[in-house]
């Protein structure tokens, strides 16, 4: 007999509930969902993925992004379109990179790469759920996606698909983005969305597709066959994954214009922001839709704005409309580029060959370039490089093409539009402008409209802030024309954001050395021609060292105007000019700051700044060491060779100068080597010196201010007056940091001088310093960087001493000054032939005219300037 249970204690019967069992299984990812990938791939999957994904490249951006995210962040990768290929690639590749790999694909169904046993369990679990609930499980309503993401799994989400809108809008299914917004609202952990796009090439999308694009899909959105063929090609460099800045949902929902919206409207705004991000991301790599040149010209000429311009021109000029239209069309035909990927590839081949055979390679600031890539995802870039060589036209296009960025449209002088270079430059994105728009209102307005059109289309624009090439080796004063037009276009809202990028393009040696020396000596500039191109082939047999490209931080115009609390659309003429001037000089200073100090510049500076005909090599080494030490202390960027082995790099350059005849070696005994400077070669050495002179100008000003003190003991306050005078005196030659005062620069240089034992602080008196015995010689070596310019300005001042007011026409002044300089040099009144520089004369003339000199009648002012110049020269050389 069975014992009966005691009364009051009910019997617990075990019963099987199919509904409960299936619900329990649905909460376990391994049993239920096709949206979840295994933690690791199986051996067969690894073989397949390695074969198909081997040509897909990923840069360091993902790791850098992940390093910035909080440790407790919930992370989802987002793509513009639904793509199982991208989901599988991200899961497979990111695991191997040590990055969070997406395992949860919201609205994805991945069955084929699931383990067999798991696939069976998924089938039975989903079947049981269907039998018990009469519908398939919804991972949104069951909380499956939410729970997995909260547990630390990384998600994968897409913005759009062919059926996505129908699913959300017509069938009222849960929106994945609405789901993660709800998730952010219930957790303190930040949710981050990382936008990523898989690119199958960098060719710009054309508004007229080719037959191949129609059949197999475009490079932007390739069909399955095109994707497959692209992936399996050997050594294919075209396929890569690109990432944009992550979106923090917590910050997004806290934005004032988002905070008060309903979840539905917040989702809509999030989708719009992501769509804009993906659009700018693609545009930052492939560029905007590429139109035919004739189509672009027609669209400009038929625009309402140009129609109004033409009507005004008819009214003001009295010409008939057809004649004015023809003139406008001719202007645009003269200006417009003919951008072609074919010519970009030719540029690539040509510069690759030159860098390998003529130069010793190119050194690129990769960190700076990465910042530029991110800025390009917010709007068009305004690239503002310095200009030292015709090669500059190719360098940035070459770099951008190699780094998967759209090549810029480049502003070039009309003098370069000659055949055959004109069509070649146009094909690479060059558009041409005249040197002056004076007295041609129609041309000016057509040109500005063309620039506005390029920016509104989304093209990057490159122009040289100095206008023409610098023949002196240092930066020239900025020209405001194109920058002013860019600011006007920005004020008209042609783009939501523009970023100005100061860029330094430097060379150990430039190809145009000889022509620059000819022009600096007063020779006429020869117009560009095919004959010059043929003669230039002789240069191809010479090695020209390295090319250096460095980027400063982009200047966001949105941030710039926000900081100044100005509306760019409401600037008056004076404010516009002030803003333009400020930005121009900021660009010039930024370019100087990111330029590279080369061994050529340091050796040339040491040779020219020593005041002796024969220089012991040991003494030359001391001077070079002093200059190099200063550069290190001021954190100046160095050429690669100076970073690896500076002594060897400087010695190699000195030997190269001997081989080229710039200097002679007075003895073959290495222990007693003496250098004799070839006086006729001083101008070319001055060009190299000027490549680095901007780094030494604060030291030169500070040194000369110290030398001007009667005693070898002084306070920092004693130096400010002289420092300020020198800054004003050479305002057209050298450009001071707009964000640093003279007092700050003096303090910084005093610290560097103390570290180099040039100065010692007074033991008891505060802010008081003494010059050491060895320091006095070094102060003269630093201040010697100013000697050439002091002598040039002395020549200009002698012009004012000799000629009364209005006796020499303004256009003839420079010729008179150059002739006077030659005579003074022959009489021994000028000791440095490099001071006979037309550019220096021009800047000196501008300074004296600005200070009020008009002619020999201004005796008191002339005498004051003369005494000061001679005083400075004597302090340095005696």
How should these model regions be labeled?
Residues 1-878:
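Membrane-interfacial terminal anchoring regions of lipid-handling membrane enzymes
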